[in-house]
Curated annotation (Swiss-Prot):
Its main location: cytoplasm. GO terms for cellular component: cytoplasm. Associates with the EF-Tu.GDP complex and induces the exchange of GDP to GTP. It remains bound to the aminoacyl-tRNA.EF-Tu.GTP complex up to the GTP hydrolysis stage on the ribosome. The gene is tsf. It holds the Pfam family EF_TS. This is Elongation factor Ts. One of its GO terms (molecular function) is translation elongation factor activity. Belongs to the EF-Ts family.
């Protein structure tokens, strides 16, 4: 019996397995849909869809800098053990390289790219990896940064727990900007700024902070003219906490980040501008299931 595209589509919808593997299963079973499902289950592939319901909050953040272009990717798995698996790490690194080489700015585009040496695309290779390793995994998010001239520097902290990109626009060579870029990326990893500068502060966040500060100042019983000066000072402190260029430089807290950039520009003999940054912390925002170890032991003992 000839295997049709609609049959492959139906089997994929039933199992969550990649197109090529579905086609092979149908070919091996003479087009028998139920037999094809069983064939995939025996190969450990059809279980991948069920695993997708499990929380994947571990994994790793990967980065790749290609001079004026930088890419960062977060790939999640269920356990830290799997995050150190060679096949998982190879997949994460390969996906990052593919994203950089093909100009990817979103996960769907990345998933559609051919995964080298497999006959599958990136999304289907991920499904295959889920079935092989036996854990849910997820290509969670991607960031791509580019400058017309200069360097996009990258940094990985704690073996992939935190990743950073920093974009430096400058006529200086990428090599000349390497040290500054790396140190600024390390600063971002440690200080976790929320915005690049005052101009990029979200207006809602700014008004919310200002409202809180006004209420606090009024509670002190000070007159309005004094309160106004207090708010200006406290907002300056707020900006110094959340804006990268106004933060105290972690390597030299006596200087702000912008001062460090200005000093580097003077030394290089040309302007240097930080045009953007991105920071991924592994698993941030993912709600993890809290395990009650004592309850688990009791359950096992009680049978």
């Amino acid at each position: 019996m000839a295997v049709t595209a609609s049959m492959v589509k139906e089997l994929r919808e039933k199992t969550g397995v990649g197109m090529m593997d579905c086609k092979k299963a149908l070919a091996e079973t003479g087009g028998d849909m139920e037999a094809a499902v069983d064939w995939l289950r025996k190969k450990g592939m059809a279980s991948a869809q069920k695993k997708s319901a499990r929380v994947a909050a571990e994994g790793k953040v990967t980065t790749l800098s290609l001079g004026s272009v930088g890419v960062m990717l977060e790939v999640n798995a269920e356990t830290d053990f799997t995050a150190k698996n060679d096949n998982f790490c190879t997949f994460a690194d390969t996906a990052t390289k593919l994203a950089a080489d093909n100009g990817c700015t979103d996960i769907d585009t990345l998933k559609a790219l051919d995964y080298p040496g497999t006959g599958r695309n990136v999304g289907d290779e991920l499904t295959n990896l889920i079935a092989t390793i036996g854990e849910n995994m997820n290509l969670r998010r991607i960031e791509r940064m580019e400058v017309s001239s200069g360097l996009v520097s990258s940094y990985i902290h704690a073996g992939g727990k935190i990743g950073v990109l920093v974009a430096l626009e400058s006529t200086a060579s990428a090599d000349a900007l390497q040290e500054l870029g790396k140190k600024l990326a390390m600063h971002v990893a440690a200080a976790a700024p929320q915005f690049l500068n005052r101009d990029s502060v979200d207006s809602e966040a700014m008004e919310r902070e200002k409202s809180v500060l006004i209420d606090q100042a009024r509670a002190s019983g000070k007159p309005d003219n004094i309160i106004e000066k207090m708010i200006v000072g406290r907002m300056d402190k707020y900006y110094a906490d959340v804006c990268l260029l106004e933060q105290a430089y972690v390597i030299d807290p006596d200087h702000k980040v912008q001062q460090v950039v200005d000093a580097a520009a003077k030394e290089l003999g040309c302007p240097v501008k930080v045009t953007g940054y991105a920071r991924f912390q592994l698993g941030e925002g993912i709600e993890k299931k809290e395990e009650d170890f004592a309850a688990e032991v009791a359950k096992v003992v009680q049978g």
